[in-house]
Amino acid sequence: QGSNGAGKSTLFNSIAGNFLVDSGRILLDDENITFTPEYKRSKYIGRLFQDPLRGTAPHMTIRENLALAYLRAGEHTKMFSRVSKKDEEKFRDVLKQLDIGLENCMDVPVGTLSGGQRQSLTLLMATIVPPKLLLLDEHTAALDPQAAEKIMALTNQIVLDNHTTCLMITHNMKSALSTGNRTLMMNQGKIIQDLNEDDKKNMDVDT
């Protein structure tokens, strides 16, 4: 949580490996990943952005996008690995979670989907192989309230079901206090407030 320019996205970019940090270390599951290349981190760090257009290949089908995400994050090391029929059944099952009928439209180009549908798909792509860490960069901010609520509910379900460590950026104080077990407030690149579950129970948006 924090205002524009507080350093939230810079923090995420450094964790994801978009650039190397000048000092300090980045540890994930007690492993030092400070100098691990971005493409290697992407196998175990999932990320969603505010813009539903990011994170998918719009001219490719739902099936092809899920296959790319699955092969990238999985243990497949061959450049031309293929997904099996069993894998495709897995894709269909995860799409059913959305309850919007996409499991019956797997050959539809992703570019034809609405913002909410595409962000739902992006969330599934980021978690189809459960990551060690999920980064959510205001992933509901560009959606209408109804779609945002549905995406947030799906996010909570996936995170809880997979026991995934998750960091979420939001400008919405209500979301910051109601989601997760810890809330950090940032300003000028520094953490200025660290709220645990008990702290959050005693606060509201007017505090």
PLM feature spans:
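Helix-to-loop junction immediately C-terminal to a conserved catalytic motif
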Residues: 16
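H-loop/switch region of ABC-family ATPase nucleotide-binding domains
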Residues: 170-171
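ABC ATPase NBD coupling module
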Residues: 32-46, 54, 77, 84, ...
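Conserved beta-strand-loop-alpha-helix hinge in the C-terminal portion
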Residues: 190-207
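Q-loop/switch helix immediately C-terminal to the Walker
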Residues: 60-72
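Conserved ABC transporter NBD signature motif
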Residues: 24-32
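Catalytic Walker B motif of ABC-type/P-loop ATPase nucleotide-binding domains
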Residues: 134-137
